[in-house]
């Protein structure tokens, strides 16, 4: 199945580079729709992740390292790879520990006593722009770019991706 090989699949951009086909890469960039011009992301990352114990004693769950990088860095990379550069992160527990470049932040000071819904409201309130598509994700769920590509293909006003094996 795809899951067993997806980490070994090279993006088309890399194939163009390896083949020295810069004209094809330029054509792809010129003619494919520019998702970043009409999309933004909101990442809900306010929780501590207390179930992780000492691992999150001095850092939020979203800053726990996976393969040498914080969870949040992997998520931001997936958005960037899909052309989504406008990213807003809702912080809560130890907000100063979440400080990645080129993203904006909203803080949920009541994160410990509220749910993700208030974090969503905080994020939406700090970056309101109804003219852009909005992708919302959790700060502790890593996903691949193809998930965003699949969402972008839908004509529906509202779509949710669910991991049926979780």
Map each language-model feature to its residues:
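Conserved SAM/SAH-binding loop
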Residues: 48
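Short, conserved phosphate/pyrophosphate- and ester-handling motifs at nucleotide-, phospho-/glycolipid
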Residues: 20
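The conserved acidic donor/metal-binding loop of glycosyltransferases
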Residues: 139-141
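Short, well-ordered alpha-helical microsegments
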Residues: 24-25, 95-96, 144-146
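Short alpha-helical oligomerization interface
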Residues: 57-61
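Conserved N-terminal catalytic core of the sugar/cofactor nucleotidyltransferase
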Residues: 2-16, 27-43, 51, 65, ...
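Conserved donor-nucleotide/metal-binding helix-loop-beta segment in metal-dependent transferases, i.e.
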Residues: 146-166
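Canonical Radical SAM [4Fe-4S] cluster-binding loop centered on the CxxxCxxC motif
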Residues: 54
């Amino acid at each position: 199945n795809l899951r067993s090989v997806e980490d070994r699949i090279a993006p088309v951009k890399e194939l163009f580079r390896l083949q020295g086909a810069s004209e094809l890469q330029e054509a792809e960039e010129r003619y494919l729709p520019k998702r970043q011009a009409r999309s933004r992301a909101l990442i809900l990352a306010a929780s501590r992740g207390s179930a992780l114990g000492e691992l999150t004693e001095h850092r939020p769950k979203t800053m726990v390292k996976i393969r040498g990088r914080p969870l949040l860095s992997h998520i931001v990379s997936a958005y960037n790879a899909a052309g989504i550069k406008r990213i807003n992160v809702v912080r809560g527990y130890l907000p100063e520990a979440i400080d990645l470049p080129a993203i904006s932040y909203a803080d949920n000071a009541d994160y410990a006593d509220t749910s993700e819904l208030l974090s969503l409201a905080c994020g939406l309130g700090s970056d309101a722009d109804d003219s852009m598509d909005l992708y919302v994700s959790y700060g502790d769920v890593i996903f691949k770019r193809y998930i965003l590509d699949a969402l972008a293909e839908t004509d529906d006003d509202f779509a949710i991706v669910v991991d049926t094996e979780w």
